[in-house]
Amino acid sequence: MVVKTIENLRLILKNELIYSSKSNKQTVLFLTGGTSIQKLYKSEKWLKIFNSFNKICFADERMVLESNSESNLGNFLRITKINPKKVVKILDKSGNLYEGYSKNITHFLKSKVYNCYAISGFGLDGHFWSLFTQIDMIKNDIVLRTKSTNHSHERITLGVKAYELLDANYFFASKEKLAKYNSDPKEPVKSYMNKIFTL
């Protein structure tokens, strides 16, 4: 596994944005959940990167309202103060999945008009996004609903099919989490990881 810094990742994404612009492509960034990535939300350099994407989506989200402190999307909006119109909403004000959400995500990933990238976190039990089980890993859905016995909320997550449609995926972790992970790497996530970026 190759480990690089988060600054390397910022420069990679900056170059991808330049390439996409020259190719007349729209850009979509899928973000991960968790606390480590929230450090990027407070960086002016990263805010510039986020604002350069046409759309921001979340690869995994708990089935909670945006006002809830456990909402990945809600925390992103609260910390970054980014233009909310850039962010693709998942749940309505009643906590129900927006009609057409899966269709919109599928359109981004399959359309030749968009270049789609993801910054993906992973769990110490071996999952990435919210793909907790082997059943999740073999489902052919682009967007799926799942739940882990270790977590209290249902999740909306991208499936492995979505992973295959991304133009690029970049795994990200704190140094502390990476050290724990390297001491006991778990499937299935290690099968997908050849490069990781860390703070």
Descriptions of predicted regions:
Residues 65-67, 97-98, 125-132, 137, ...:
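Short acidic/glycine-rich loop or secondary-structure boundary segments that cap or lie
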Residues 120, 124-160:
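Class I SAM-dependent methyltransferase SAM-binding "motif I" and its flanking Rossmann-like core
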Residues 1-29:
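N-terminal glycine-/serine-/threonine-rich phosphate-binding loop
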Residues 47-55, 82, 137, 161-167, ...:
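Short, conserved loop/helix-junction motifs that constitute active-site signature segments
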Residues 165-199:
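ATP/nucleoside-binding phosphotransfer catalytic cores, i.e., glycine-rich phosphate-binding loops
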Residues 31-36, 120-124:
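Glycine-rich beta-strand-to-loop/alpha-helix junction loops that act as flexible
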Residues 43-51, 74, 133-141:
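A glycine- and small-aliphatic-rich helix-loop capping segment at beta-alpha/alpha-beta transitions
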Residues 10, 51-119:
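Ligand-binding beta-strand-loop-alpha-helix segment within the catalytic cores
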